[in-house]
Amino acid sequence: MDDVAIVSFNDSVIALEHFSYNKDNYALIISDLRMPNLNGLELLKKVKKLNPTVRTILLSAYEVDNDAIFQQYMKEGIIDSFMEKPVTISDLCQRVRDEFQVYQLASYVK
């Protein structure tokens, strides 16, 4: 993970616009569920349409296991990983490493 750059946005619409112009430069997107304009589910669905190989982590402080849309997005691979907040830095770093490993393995298979 030496060549990793972190880009942060506080507006999901601007984040999506940026991603649409740079979609091949991303391996991982981390999003919160509750955001103004586009929520995390909507954002990650649009991200996966632009680049199906990008890995996604959804964060939320809310119970989502019983949410039908959440379950469907997990089955469809729109959400690759879910973490319930509060999240520790060490847990988040480990999950990021795991998702990068999956991304790299998938890149070798191509």
PLM feature spans:
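Short amphipathic alpha-helix used as the core "switch/output" element in two-component signaling
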Residues: E17, L41-T53
